[in-house]
Amino acid sequence: MGAMCYMVEIHVVNTKEDLRAALDLRVEVFVDEQKIPVCDEVDHLDNIGAILDGKVIHVVAISNLQIVGTARIIFDVPEDEYPHIGRVAVKRIMRDNQIGRSIMNKLHQILKEKGCQGATLSAQLEVKDFYIKLGYVQRGKTYMDVGILHQDMDYIF
């Protein structure tokens, strides 16, 4: 059976309610599904203060008034590094519906509008090909993070 087509809108998070819903989805995907400890999943950038300070932008994908995907861009990085995309998550029943691609396109649009030259991310090995299809290039060797193999990847605009 082919993937269904869903109307999805990607919004920048600017309320505590949307941030809470994004974090709930991340816990569902990373903690419940992948068994990552919650203390490794939620960090100091997951609050409205970090958003207001410009350290991070969170986005949510909304379909039928439900948050079905989320991700964030970290701008609080060393001066010689690109902003870091992370915590890309899509609700299990909504995968294979281009939602991840829509989220990444929105993140790239945000970065371009801010004058950034590229982005970096740490991909779980099992979804590395998703990022390669978007134009990301592998950097360095694979490594373990929270018990899962990862690969650093870069995207140049």
Identify the residue ranges that each predicted region occupies.
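Short amphipathic alpha-helix that is part of the acyltransferase structural core
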Residues: 2-49, 53, 58, 62-66
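Conserved beta-strand in the GNAT
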Residues: 60, 65-75, 82-84, 89
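Conserved catalytic-core motifs of GNAT/GCN5-like acyltransferases
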Residues: 122, 132, 137-152
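Conserved acetyl-CoA-binding loop-helix of GNAT-fold acetyltransferases
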Residues: 90, 96-109
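Conserved GNAT acetyl-CoA-binding A-motif
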Residues: 104, 111-124
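Short, well-ordered beta-strand micro-motif
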Residues: 60-62, 152-156
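A conserved beta-turn-beta hairpin within the catalytic core of GNAT-like acetyltransferases
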Residues: 75-85, 95, 146-150
